[in-house]
């Protein structure tokens, strides 16, 4: 159609302020759920019908290391990233041939979000531009054979 993407990078995410689950304010918890799960679903619904129509495309839903493990004081974030893993794998089972959906753990990247959790220790991790040099070729190589696989940028 000319307007149908080959790849959708679905990277909506917020993280809660570090706190035990019972101390995370209800509104903050809801906002993390709304952005990290519902936001991802809205993007999928916006692009997937056109991709199905043309019979090709890859949806990359960004997960996290915390979508496959957990850590104290970020329970809401962990819960949403585990949800992205399951949501994406279920979506992959629903897709017609020629399409793919993958949950992608980008690895640890020096971002403001990471700084909110790790403080000055975040600076020991790669900058986004350094990460992109490795990730872009990896992501561009994704295709139908990767459908449903939990992948990581290493």
What label would you give each PLM region?
Residues 24, 70-78, 90, 117:
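Active-site loop-to-helix junction immediately N-terminal to the catalytic Tyr of the SDR YXXXK motif
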Residues 97-99, 103-104, 111, 120-154:
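C-terminal helical subdomain
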Residues 12-17:
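Conserved NAD(P)H cofactor-binding loop of Rossmann-fold oxidoreductase domains
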Residues 19-21, 28-30:
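Substrate-binding pocket helix/loop in short-chain dehydrogenase/reductase
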Residues 64:
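Residue(s) in the substrate-gating loop at a strand-loop-helix junction
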Residues 44, 80:
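Active-site helix of classical SDR
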Residues 69, 90-99:
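Active-site-adjacent segment of SDR/Rossmann-fold oxidoreductases
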């Amino acid at each position: 159609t000319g307007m149908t993407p080959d790849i959708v990078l679905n990277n909506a995410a917020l993280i809660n302020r570090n706190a035990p689950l019972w101390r995370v304010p209800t509104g903050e918890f809801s906002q993390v759920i709304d952005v990290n799960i519902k936001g991802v679903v809205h993007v999928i619904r916006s692009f997937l019908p056109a991709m199905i129509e043309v019979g090709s495309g890859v949806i990359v839903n960004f997960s996290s290391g915390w979508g496959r493990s957990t850590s104290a004081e970020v329970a809401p974030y962990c819960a949403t990233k585990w949800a992205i893993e399951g949501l994406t794998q279920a979506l992959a089972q629903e897709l017609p041939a020629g399409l793919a959906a993958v949950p992608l753990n980008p690895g640890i990247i020096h971002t403001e979000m990471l700084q909110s959790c790790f403080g000055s220790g975040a600076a020991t991790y790669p900058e986004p531009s350094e990460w992109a040099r490795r990730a872009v070729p990896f992501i561009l190589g994704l295709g139908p054979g990767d459908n449903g696989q939990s992948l990581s940028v290493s």
